[in-house]
Design a protein with these regions (language model features):
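Active-site loops and adjacent core secondary-structure elements that bind or stabilize anionic groups
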Residues: 1-198, 213-231
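Gly-rich Lys/Arg/Thr-decorated short loops/hinges at beta-loop-alpha junctions or inter-strand turns
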Residues: 23-35, 108-114, 188-207, 284-306, ...
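Conserved helix-loop functional segments at active or binding sites
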Residues: 53, 226, 263-267, 352, ...
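Flexible, glycine/charged-enriched surface loops at secondary-structure junctions
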Residues: 57-65, 163-166, 229-236, 266-277, ...
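Active-site-proximal loop/turn and secondary-structure-junction residues that shape catalytic pockets
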Residues: 70, 124, 236-239, 341, ...
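Glycine- and Gly-Pro-enriched alpha-helical subdomains that act as flexible
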Residues: 72-110, 241-340
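C-terminal binding/interaction regions
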Residues: 116, 120-121, 134-164, 169-171, ...
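Nucleic-acid 5′ end/cap handling module spanning
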Residues: 219, 227, 234-237, 244, ...
Length: 391
């Protein structure tokens, strides 16, 4: 391993020269294939920290899908039911635990994950590599690769696919630096350990959090730790199902993440699962068509002369009433927020997406209103006392 890696350019093609380097010692990575770019590496290093912490917290293999320095998906290896396998388009393959985590992370928000960078907590096996090979992505970072997996990945994207191996034992300095406008910022790294001890203070009337919900709250909080702020994360069944990143308004975060969670659940509606696709439709076209079909712009794919491009017969509209009725059956969702909720409107929006459990710092002057809104819906809310801003 070297102490410097020259890059083609920085964030944009005009930003030259570009490199990553270590002032002391060697880089903890080895590029096994491809030529990763500046943003690829930002995604790689942020996503690696996320999956490493997920694995440590849950003791399960973990995976993340990153785009523009925020996760589109994050998950651990919780076995999937047949419905999830079908909507993630992995019902035709054998899934190892790591492949299961990857399928969940990639499948949560397929529109946002298109062209992502992948992080894996464990050695990439053949089953995971075969799944990665089917999707459009920029690269992957993992602690190692089996020979079979590496061979598959090296042949992806005409041999240019980015494959990075990272030393899992690497620990950065406790002080980190960042230059902005020629001025150096220095701070202690956010080494806060996220575990169930953060969920002990519950100001709500309902204070019962099942084990799987505690796991999901931990997943949401760790995901937020590496998401551009402001951020909110909905989680269920061992994975993030909706991430709202980089919004200036807290309620906009909650709405954005909630809308993504709604889409995740609506994809499980029988009308969506039984859409009559034409043969050999491209994966990207199928994902985009589902996204439009679920939305209020469904005519864009159902109008005469257009639906024939995607379907063997014209599907029925998924009506607003049908969507609301289906969403009303979604329950047991966990939600994390990287900062406090200033008003109860966030809770009202979360309730519409089946949220039953919440973890947020607390500390708003309107905490009483937020708590009473949770009590109205019999939600459990934990005050973690920690803020998780990330920039």
């Amino acid at each position: 391993m070297a102490n410097e890696l020259e890059l083609k350019y920085g964030c944009n093609p005009n930003q030259k020269p570009a490199r990553i380097f270590m002032k002391d010692g060697e880089l903890p990575i080895e590029v096994l294939n491809g030529r990763p770019g500046y943003i690829n590496l930002l995604d790689a290093f942020n996503s690696w920290q996320l999956v490493k912490e997920l694995k440590e917290a849950t003791k399960l293999p973990a995976a993340a899908s990153f785009k523009h320095v925020s996760p589109a998906g994050a998950a651990v290896a919780v076995e999937m039911n047949d419905t999830l396998k079908k909507i993630y388009f992995v019902d035709d393959v054998k899934l190892s635990p790591l492949a299961t985590a990857y399928a969940r992370a990639r499948g949560a928000d397929r529109m946002s994950s298109y062209g992502d960078f992948i992080a894996l907590s464990d050695t990439c096996d053949e089953e995971t590599a075969r799944l990665i090979n089917r999707e459009v992505s920029d690269g992957v970072i993992a602690p190692d690769y089996t020979p079979e997996a590496l061979e598959i990945l090296k042949n992806k994207r005409k041999g240019t696919y980015n494959v990075i191996k990272i030393d899992p034992a690497y620990r950065p300095d406790s002080i980190e630096h960042k230059d902005v406008f020629g001025i150096t910022f220095e701070q202690g790294r956010n080494e806060l350990k996220i575990d169930e001890s953060l969920l002990k203070e519950m100001p709500t009337q309902n204070q019962v959090i099942p084990a799987d919900a505690k796991r999901d709250l931990i997943i949401a909080l760790i995901t937020l730790k590496y998401t551009q702020s402001n951020s909110v994360c909905y989680a269920k069944d061992g994975q993030a199902i909706g991430i709202g990143a980089g919004q200036q308004s807290r309620i906009h975060c909650t709405r954005l993440a909630g809308n993504k969670a709604d889409i995740w659940y609506l994809r499980q509606h029988p009308k969506v699962m039984n859409l009559p696709w034409i043969e050999k439709i491209r994966r990207a076209d199928r994902d985009n068509t589902i996204d439009i079909y679920i939305s209020e712009d469904y005519d864009d794919v159902l109008a005469d002369g257009i639906w024939q491009q995607f379907f063997t017969e014209k599907p029925e509209v998924l009506t607003r009433e049908e969507k609301r009725a289906w969403l009303n059956t979604m329950t047991g969702v966990s939600l994390g927020s990287d900062a406090f909720f200033p008003f109860g409107d966030n809770i009202e929006r979360a309730h519409k997406s089946g949220v039953s459990y919440i973890a947020q710092p607390g500390g708003s002057v309107r905490d009483d209103h937020v708590i009473s809104t949770c009590d109205k819906y019999n939600m459990v809310m934990a005050f973690t006392g920690i803020r998780l801003f990330h920039h």
